[in-house]
């Protein structure tokens, strides 16, 4: 599949979607995007910058949600033009899709909205590549009908993203079989290595996380075989305004990516035949 200006798939190198969870300030987004461009350029990794203008599903109603649509799009446009990288953001049910699609290169649907038929169709009808996150409550094979809805709009640039499955209260688990199962959708599969270590609502008024397991799950996913990696990152996760406990430190991103790209090369060299 053609994504932005590069090809993605199991016959192509791993690509990266990364950035801070939420847009905190113009300068932070430019700094992080610039550093990620430097790292990915050095390693030869195709890169899409990600950040959200509105986090509509925060645990607490008083938590920081972002700068909003107008200011958020200004920041994303600045990142795109000044840093020279494609940008992705997530949208919601009442987002003016065409307005967002006029700025960003890739749209993303939140996991909680994966079963909302009209929403999925409206996003995909905007004509941009779409990264559809699998709900924490959804079986991997249940992504096939979701993709069918998405492609019924005529949009063939659809990706599916694994971000963990609910495992009791305040916990997620990553079933690596799902990455293989979701290939049956015919779409590139992306693994979200940072939300997969989230502890939803685990801190009472906010979600917790176990970022020490990000490399563990990322390595496992790459070994199974994926097209892309999604990872939220921050210069100082302890001060991040959203999802800090599961964000990967920016100064450790190069080391992680270097390892993952080596694993990706070996994995894809040996193919993906299923064994009975």
Swiss-Prot record:
Pathway annotation: Carbohydrate biosynthesis; 3-deoxy-D-manno-octulosonate biosynthesis; 3-deoxy-D-manno-octulosonate from D-ribulose 5-phosphate: step 2/3; Bacterial outer membrane biogenesis; lipopolysaccharide biosynthesis
Keyword Cytoplasm carried by entry: yes
GO cellular component labels: cytoplasm
InterPro entries attached to this UniProt entry: Aldolase_TIM (IPR013785), DAHP1/KDSA (IPR006218), KDO8P_synthase (IPR006269)
Subcellular location: Cytoplasm
Keywords tagged on the record: Cytoplasm, Lipopolysaccharide biosynthesis, Transferase
Entry EC number(s): 2.5.1.55
GO aspect biological process, one term: keto-3-deoxy-D-manno-octulosonic acid biosynthetic process
Transcription regulation among keywords: no
Catalytic activity, as annotated: D-arabinose 5-phosphate + phosphoenolpyruvate + H2O = 3-deoxy-alpha-D-manno-2-octulosonate-8-phosphate + phosphate
GO molecular function: 3-deoxy-8-phosphooctulonate synthase activity
Tree of life domain: Bacteria
Primary location recorded for the protein, binned into one broad class: cytoplasm
Matching NCBIfam families: KDO8P_synth, PRK05198.1
Similarity-based family: Belongs to the KdsA family.
Record PANTHER family: PHOSPHO-2-DEHYDRO-3-DEOXYHEPTONATE ALDOLASE
Xref: HAMAP family: KDO8P_synth
Name assigned to this protein: 2-dehydro-3-deoxyphosphooctonate aldolase
Gene source species: Xanthomonas axonopodis pv. citri (strain 306)
